[in-house]
């Protein structure tokens, strides 16, 4: 997960300041992996709960810098997602919720073309959860 997070940071054109750090927590009912990276314009955090079926992942890309959310979605393909939900929060408007979206495809690993056509902001702060 450290390599994946480092690659994501490179692909969305952010500057890594520290990390990524990765830790597995083995607590029944809440076991999973947490990854945190400090970037020049804020942070990236990921939590993966492996007890759920299917596994659940939450990824926060929080930045005051511009980036293209579709690049994050493309990188998430590495995990073979079958469902993706996202929230766009605008820091300029005191974190007003500006956009909510969802992509779901029962055929695992296909249908990303429809996601590319979704109404996405050109620059965003992304909370995938």
Place the predicted regions along the sequence by residue.
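Polybasic/polar functional segments that serve as interface/processing modules
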Residues: 1-129
């Amino acid at each position: 997960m450290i390599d994946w997070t480092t690659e994501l940071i490179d692909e969305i054109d952010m500057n890594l300041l520290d990390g990524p750090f990765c830790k597995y927590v083995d607590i029944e009912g809440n076991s999973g992996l947490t990854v945190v990276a400090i970037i020049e314009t804020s942070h990236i955090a990921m939590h993966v709960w492996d007890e759920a079926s299917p596994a659940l992942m939450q990824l926060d890309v929080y930045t005051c810098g511009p980036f293209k959310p579709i690049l994050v979605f493309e990188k998430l393909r590495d995990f073979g997602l079958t469902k993706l939900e996202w929230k766009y929060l605008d820091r300029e408007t005191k974190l007003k919720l500006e956009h909510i979206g969802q992509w779901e495809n029962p055929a695992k690993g296909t249908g990303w073309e429809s996601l590319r056509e979704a109404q996405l902001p050109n620059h965003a702060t992304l909370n995938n959860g």
